[in-house]
Amino acid sequence: VYKRQPLFHAGAYYVQEASSMFLEQAIKAYVKEPVRCLDLCAAPGGKSTHLASLLPDGSLLVSNEVIRSRSYVPAENIAKWGRPDTIVINNDPEEIGEALPHLFDVIVTDVPCSGEGMFRKDTDSTGEWSVDNVRLCASRGRRIIHDIWNALKPGGILIYSTCTYNTEEDEENIHYIIEELGAEALPIPTQEEWQITGALRFEHPVYRFFP
């Protein structure tokens, strides 16, 4: 229904799931001054428009989508948003990591996943799920983080998220980032009434949103 409203097409608002909006809590907790921020897997652009509204004045937001055919969607949404401090690019994470070492203060990685969080909205997606696909997505998530890690400034913030529930793509990949790349997992302030679930494996601060 909202897609018929002129204000939506004018960029006055963008509709997201509550779990996607949790990005705001991480930014507010750790970003206090202008930064260079990369939204690595940006399509369709909801997180980029949210970041554009959240980042302190004077920040630069780079919105990247690896798949060229999908990159036009965030470009359109960001153009509607009307922020001049946002750039849309179409590059592989490895290319960015090699070309822009230690450039970004913040990198947001909402990595491609097996999509278990979509089952309640799209019943057809259950037929695409398999154990092999979970393993493939978990491996791809690690590769994406490994490839982009060099672009993160020492002491910078990397936000890792998925729209799936299994521990292989979530807790195990976070554990990989900590153990193999030397990251520190930081807590994000929450409230009890939000009913957020913690980690199912390991003891790292993890935030799960179940329907």
Predicted regions span which residues?
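S-adenosylmethionine
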Residues: 3-211
